[in-house]
From Swiss-Prot:
Family to which the UniProt record says this protein belongs: Belongs to the FKBP-type PPIase family. Tig subfamily.
Organism: Synechocystis sp. (strain ATCC 27184 / PCC 6803 / Kazusa)
Catalytic activity: [protein]-peptidylproline (omega=180) = [protein]-peptidylproline (omega=0)
Protein name (Swiss-Prot/TrEMBL): Trigger factor
Record keywords: Cell cycle, Cell division, Chaperone, Cytoplasm, Isomerase, Rotamase
Length: 471
C-alpha cells in the first residue's frame, strides 16, 4: 500500500493512501456477500437473495459507499502502523465522498486523502531556553509570621469567659437573636424578611466579618439590649431576598463572651509542639518560616521561567490536545468548587452553553500549559535529563503512603512522578542559566506572574487515583 505524507497546519498530517485493486475487490465482494446474507427483500428467504437482486434493490451507490467506508477504516489503520505515525484523535476524510462513490471501481486501485492531528514537536530557536530573562517576586522572611502563628494557636485554645460588667467590644463573641425588616417610607422597620431570622447566633466581633455595619452596630451594646442596625447588602449577595437592598436588622444581645488567651510560656510550647520551652519553639518556627520564604521565592522564579518558556514555543498545537487540556482544566475547576462546598451539578445543569463557555474561557491557559509542557519535554530530551529509577521509586513510595487506602492506578502514578521529577530537574537547570530579576513581594500582578498552586500536586494525584472500574 502506497502512502504519501503531507505536513498540514495546526500539527496535522495529511495522508494520501493508494489502496490496491486487490483490496478494493476483496472488500467490495465481502460487502455484497454480507448483504445477501442479511438483507430482507419480500419474496425471498433471508440469506437466499440473489446477488443481482441485492445490487438492484439497494443500488450501486449504497454498496459502493459501504465498501469505501470499510476500505477507509482498514487503510487508515494499516497506514498508521506502516508509517509509525504518532496520531492523536480521529481521522477526517479530505476526499469528497460523493466523488469517491462515482469513481470507485472494485477492479481498480482507489486513492483516498485523510488528515489527523499528530503529537507535536516543540519548535523553538536553538538554545533560546538558555537565555531566558524574567522577573519574579522575592518573598522576605518576616518575624511577624512567628507572632501570627503563635496568636493563631492561642486563639484555638482560648477560653470563652462570660462578660457582664461592660458592653461588647471588638474581639468578643456575641450571642444574639436577630431578624431583618424592610425599610418603611418613614425609615422605620417595615415588613419582616422571613428568610433572615435566627436565634442564639454566634457573632465574632471582628472587622470584615458579615455584612458591613453589623459588627460596628453590635460593638457598644449591653447584654439584653435590643437595637435596630441599618445595613445595605451588596448586589452580589447570594440571598436574593436581600441582595442590593437596604435592610434594618433587629439585634438582641443575649450574651457576651471574652476570649481569654493562654500565656505564651513553656507550658504553652509543650502543648502545641514537641519542644519544652518557648525559646526552642520560636527558634524552630523562625527556621521554618525562613525556609518557607526561600521556597516561595524559588517557586516564583520557576513559575516566571515556565511562563517565558512557553513563549519560546513557535510550533503548532493540534486541536485535539487543546480540547483535552480544556476538559482537564474545567474538571479541575469543578473539583475546586466542590471543595468550597458548592454544588457543581447546578452549574452544569444550566446547559451545554455554560459548559462550552467554561471551556472557551480556559482555552488561553490550556494553550499556555501545552506549550510549556512541550518545551520542557524537548529540553529534557536535548539535555538528556531524566530521573533515576531510585528517585521515581522513592517518590512513588512517598505518594502511596500519603494516599494510603486510596485506589491508585500504578501506571498513571509512575507516569505522573516521572513527568513531575523531569520537570523539576529541567527547571533547576534553567534556573542556573536564566537571568531573573527579583522584585519586592506584591510588585507583580497575578497576570504577570503565575504563583504555583499549593494544591497542584494533590490535584494531580487525585487524578491519578480517579480510576473507574471500566479501566
Amino acid at each position: 500500500m502506497k502512502v504519501t505524507q503531507e505536513k498540514l497546519p495546526d500539527s496535522q498530517v495529511g495522508l494520501e493512501i493508494e489502496i490496491p485493486a486487490t483490496a478494493s475487490k476483496k472488500v467490495y465482494e465481502n460487502v455484497v456477500k454480507k448483504l445477501t446474507r442479511t438483507v430482507n427483500i419480500p419474496g425471498f428467504r433471508r440469506g437466499k437473495v440473489p446477488r443481482a437482486i441485492v445490487i438492484q434493490r439497494l443500488g450501486q451507490s449504497y454498496i459502493k459507499a459501504t465498501a469505501i467506508e470499510e476500505l477507509i477504516d482498514d487503510s487508515i489503520k494499516a497506514a498508521v502502523k506502516q508509517e509509525e505515525l504518532p496520531i492523536i484523535g480521529n481521522f477526517s476524510l479530505r476526499s469528497d465522498m460523493e466523488n469517491l462513490i462515482q469513481i470507485f471501481d472494485p477492479e481498480a486501485p482507489l486513492t483516498i486523502k485523510v488528515a489527523a492531528d499528530v503529537f507535536p514537536e516543540a519548535e523553538y530557536e536553538p538554545e533560546s531556553y538558555k537565555k531566558i530573562t524574567a522577573q519574579a517576586e522575592e518573598i522576605e522572611y518576616s518575624a511577624d509570621a512567628v507572632d501570627q502563628w503563635l496568636k493563631g494557636e492561642q486563639e484555638k485554645r482560648a477560653t470563652l469567659v462570660p462578660v457582664e460588667d461592660r458592653p461588647a467590644a471588638l474581639g468578643d463573641l456575641a450571642i444574639v437573636d436577630y431578624a431583618a425588616f424592610q425599610v418603611a417610607e418613614d425609615g422605620q422597620a417595615g415588613e419582616a424578611i422571613a428568610e433572615v431570622k435566627g436565634s442564639d447566633f454566634e457573632v465574632t466581633l471582628e472587622d470584615g466579618r458579615f455584612v458591613a455595619g453589623i459588627v460596628d452596630g453590635i460593638v457598644g451594646m449591653a447584654v439584653d439590649e435590643t437595637k435596630l442596625i441599618p445595613v445595605t447588602f451588596p448586589e452580589d449577595y447570594p440571598l436574593e431576598a436581600v441582595a442590593g437592598e437596604d435592610v434594618l436588622f433587629e439585634i438582641k444581645l443575649k450574651e457576651i463572651k471574652f476570649r481569654e488567651l493562654p500565656e505564651l510560656d513553656d507550658d504553652f510550647a509543650e502543648d502545641v509542639s514537641e519542644f519544652e520551652t518557648m525559646a526552642e519553639l520560636k527558634a524552630d518556627l523562625e527556621k521554618q518560616f525562613q525556609e518557607q520564604a526561600k521556597q516561595r521565592t524559588d517557586d516564583n522564579i520557576k513559575a516566571a521561567i515556565k511562563k517565558k518558556l512557553g513563549e519560546l514555543f513557535t510550533g503548532d498545537l493540534p486541536e485535539t490536545m487543546i480540547k483535552q487540556e480544556c476538559d482537564r482544566l474545567v474538571a479541575q475547576t469543578a473539583m475546586e468548587l466542590e471543595r468550597m462546598g458548592l454544588d457543581v451539578s447546578q452549574l452544569f445543569r444550566q446547559g451545554d452553553d455554560m459548559l462550552q463557555t467554561l471551556k472557551d474561557n480556559s482555552r488561553p491557559e490550556a494553550i499556555a500549559n501545552l506549550k510549556t509542557d512541550l518545551m520542557i519535554g524537548a529540553i529534557a530530551k536535548e539535555e538528556k535529563i531524566q530521573p533515576t529509577e531510585a528517585e521515581v521509586k522513592e517518590r512513588c513510595d512517598e505518594l502511596r503512603q500519603e494516599f494510603k487506602g486510596e485506589k491508585i492506578d500504578e501506571s498513571r502514578l509512575v507516569n505522573f512522578v516521572e513527568s513531575s521529577l523531569t520537570e523539576s530537574k529541567v527547571l533547576d537547570l534553567l534556573k542556573e542559566w536564566a537571568d531573573v530579576e527579583l522584585l519586592p513581594e506584591g510588585s507583580l500582578s497575578q497576570t504577570e506572574e503565575d504563583t504555583p498552586d499549593d494544591d497542584a500536586e494533590e490535584e494531580a494525584i487525585v487524578d491519578v487515583e480517579a480510576t473507574s472500574d471500566e479501566e
